Amino acid sequence: MGGYILAIDQGTTSTRAIVFDGNQKIAGVGQKEFKQHFPKSGWVEHDPEEIWQTVVSTVKEAIEKSGITANDIAAIGITNQRETVVVWDRETGKPIHNAIVWQDRRTAAFCDKLKKKGLEKTFVKKTGLLLDPYFSGTKLNWLLSNVKGAQVRAAKGELCFGTIDTFLIWRLTGGECFCTDATNASRTLLYNIAENAWDDELTEVLRVPKEMLPEVKDCAADFGVTDPSLFGAAIPILGVAGDQQAATIGQACFKPGMLKSTYGTGCFALLNTGKDMVRSKNRLLTTIAYRLDGETTYALEGSIFVAGAAVQWLRDGLKVIKAAPDTGSLAESADPSQEVYLVPAFTGLGAPHWDPDARGAIFGMTRNTGPAEFARAALEAVCYQTRDLLEAMHKDWRRNGNDTVLRVDGGMVASDWTMQRLSDLLDAPVDRPVILETTALGVAWLAGSRAGVWPNQEAFAKSWARDRRFEPHMDEATRKVKLKGWRSAVKRTLIAA
């Protein structure tokens, strides 16, 4: 067995498999997109079987491109889109319904009903999360209530619930391991993050039988071995973390006060708060950053639902660009005298507003507004929303002032224009790492360190390397005008909702 580590990165729009060598360098990559299903307005689903097929095919592709065999892989790490819900038959392994995706808003009315009963404080206290359709618990309640016979079958122990990681572990191990990790469990509205256990009161409120819940393990732990018939070897699965927590690890944000922001379909900023569960007074989430050797490290998180998705909208909806990388150069050519604001509330607004009913809007258009101004507005919207998150975080986390350097990753950060504008609007330095695949790298480190073939935490943190630091160049007067315009646009969007 070699020192190679395989990272499975199961995302919202595609699945990636990445093989890292013993020096933490990428040896081979496989990637495959899958279909998004929109049965009704505000509903988003995935076919779990299609996701499973993309995992198998991308793993095989990555191994082949690496020029190795499955026997050379020391361990597998799995990272995944969080909150997305799958329920399957314990005997056959077949899903009873499409997966309900984290973006799905169908349970908004149910969340409001629970809030009116005064239950949000209970959920916040125990889970660190708000009562929002974003999280798994109300989606699971919907499945049990709307799929014929599901509630009764779940109570009999005939059904399994899991986030995507759990479903993949089950499939990869041939049903031998029914488990998840603490980071994914912490996103379900069912897990008590102080006690590190499924919560009896919350499962009762959401009518979720505990018989269908997986075992919760540390992020670096034994999650079984792959069925040899899949890839030609029984490979141990030794690391699991939700995508944003995996990125936090991949960015080596191990010390309290360190901060990262990932720009994929959405944008997610996490601030390491160490052993302290910092309770936000600014509508941020208190969540588990990682759990290693039985010790939990917590984080503050801000979630934005639309980041890269706004660029996809430019490409697929407005058709003003042919490919996502074109956005930065198009934005750069925009007329500086035009201040156009896009509030991309396509599926509601996330932190710190948490308004599922808000809808997207564009402000400031004139007869001369064109594709370049739309492109700039889409990219700037991501920057403005990041600033909103970081301002809320600094109010909750006052220990080190506001001099934090933001570490960034994800597909959007390859754009120099976007990162410079982010630094300008934050009025803070932004660090882009050499390795942009930080989500996969983070979970690869979990698996590799557990397998004993990758360095310990301290050495791994020292190996983090910066590609470029972006420093703010925008003058204060310009920044104030732009921020005032953004806040006005958001306010009008919320009023319209």
From Swiss-Prot:
Residues the entry annotates as binding ADP: 12, 16, 265, 308, 411
Record InterPro entries: ATPase_NBD, Carb_kinase_FGGY, Carb_kinase_FGGY_CS, FGGY_C, FGGY_N, Glycerol_kin
Biological process terms in GO annotation: glycerol catabolic process; glycerol metabolic process; glycerol-3-phosphate metabolic process
Keyword ATP-binding: yes
EC code(s) of this entry: 2.7.1.30
GO CC aspect terms: cytosol
CDD domains linked to this entry: FGGY_EcGK_like
Residues bound to glycerol: 82-83, 134, 243-244
GO molecular function: ATP binding; glycerol kinase activity
Record entry for activity regulation: Inhibited by fructose 1,6-bisphosphate (FBP).
Keyword field: ATP-binding, Glycerol metabolism, Kinase, Nucleotide-binding, Plasmid, Transferase
Functional pathway: Polyol metabolism; glycerol degradation via glycerol kinase pathway; sn-glycerol 3-phosphate from glycerol: step 1/1
Any Pfam family the entry gives: FGGY_N
Residues that bind sn-glycerol 3-phosphate: 12, 82-83, 134, 243
Catalytic activity, as annotated: glycerol + ATP = sn-glycerol 3-phosphate + ADP + H(+)
Keyword Disulfide bond: no
Annotated residues for binding of ATP: 12-14, 265, 308, 312, 411
Similarity comment: family membership: Belongs to the FGGY kinase family.
Function: Key enzyme in the regulation of glycerol uptake and metabolism. Catalyzes the phosphorylation of glycerol to yield sn-glycerol 3-phosphate.
PANTHER family assigned to the protein according to its UniProt record, in alphabetical order: GLYCEROL KINASE, SUGAR KINASE
NCBIfam families named among the record's database cross-references: glycerol_kin (TIGR01311), PRK00047.1 (NF000756)
Protein name: Glycerol kinase
Source organism of the structure: Rhizobium meliloti (strain 1021)
UniProt lineage: Bacteria, Pseudomonadati, Pseudomonadota, Alphaproteobacteria, Hyphomicrobiales
